[in-house]
Amino acid sequence: MLIFPLKKEWYEKIKSGEKTVEYRELKPYWSSRLSKEFEFNQYAFCNIGDILEMVTYWYPIKLRLGYTKKYMEALVNKIEIVNGKNTDLAIDKPVYAIHLADVKEVK
């Protein structure tokens, strides 16, 4: 199961339901981790506009508050590649938009 460390601001926004998409820059580190976990070809799925929809199975992940023991669990129902300009990252580069569903804090 993938673990996404988050800053407190983003952790709280996801927890409240205000934020439903987590963004990660399209770099070899995240491409490798995502392609292994979600079983896709990282070299074929690498252009803005590409969409990977989880039709039959939603993948579980953990969203952790920094490097503490506090975390939430969520399901990923879609990953797409978008321009990061209008995202939390605010960069003019391709980014993974990881769509979250069924977010629950684990106590």
What does each model-found stretch correspond to?
Residues P5-K107:
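Structured alpha/beta reader/binder surfaces that contact nucleic acids or chromatin modification marks
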Residues M1-L2:
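Short structural boundary motif marking the start of a folded domain
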